[in-house]
């Protein structure tokens, strides 16, 4: 990926993260949101309560959505949808602070529920990998949180 594309992606991810942080009610005073490069997670969120790193996964890309609509589709790297999700969840990132996963999508649709259910099943059966929490931030401000063995829809709206 060219450095210009990486910069555009990083700027967009910071914007999404700011919207997410606002939706869950995290104050935006005295915080810093920094983009990071591989092998670190995408975002470093610095706040007085303690720093947290976030890896972001955009669930509206055709690569991610289409296989969820038809579970039999195979990716070019021969990974199924479940394998692709597991690969993301179980990637090892270099970070000395807790890491959360933020799965986000812009538009509400029936596929949103498919994303939630497919990911929830993987997390329930296989765990969260290196992530402390898995957050879902979706169309119309729907926000869900997964932590180890519990799952909750948060009553927040963007």
Language-model regions: role of each:
Residues 50-52, 100:
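Structural motif
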Residues 45-47, 138:
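Short acidic, glycine-rich loop/turn motifs
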Residues 1-38, 57-158:
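Metal-dependent nuclease catalytic core centered on acidic motifs
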Residues 37-39, 47-50:
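A short, glycine/Asx- and small/polar-enriched loop/turn
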Residues 43-45, 52-60:
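Conserved catalytic cores of phosphodiester-cleaving nucleases, focusing on short active-site segments
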């Amino acid at each position: 990926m060219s450095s210009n594309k990486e910069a555009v992606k990083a700027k967009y991810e910071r914007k999404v993260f700011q919207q997410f942080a606002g939706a869950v009610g995290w104050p935006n005073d005295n915080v810093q949101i920094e983009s990071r490069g591989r092998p670190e997670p995408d975002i470093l969120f610095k706040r007085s309560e303690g720093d947290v790193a976030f890896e972001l996964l955009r669930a509206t890309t055709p690569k991610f959505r289409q296989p969820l609509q038809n579970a039999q589709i195979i990716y070019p790297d021969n990974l199924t949808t479940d394998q692709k999700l597991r690969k993301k969840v179980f990637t090892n990132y270099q970070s000395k602070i807790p890491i959360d996963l933020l799965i986000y999508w812009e538009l509400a649709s029936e596929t949103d529920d498919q994303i939630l259910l497919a990911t929830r099943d993987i997390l329930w059966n296989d765990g969260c990998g290196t992530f402390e929490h898995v957050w879902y931030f979706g169309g119309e401000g729907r926000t869900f949180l997964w932590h180890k063995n519990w799952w909750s829809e948060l009553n927040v709206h963007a």
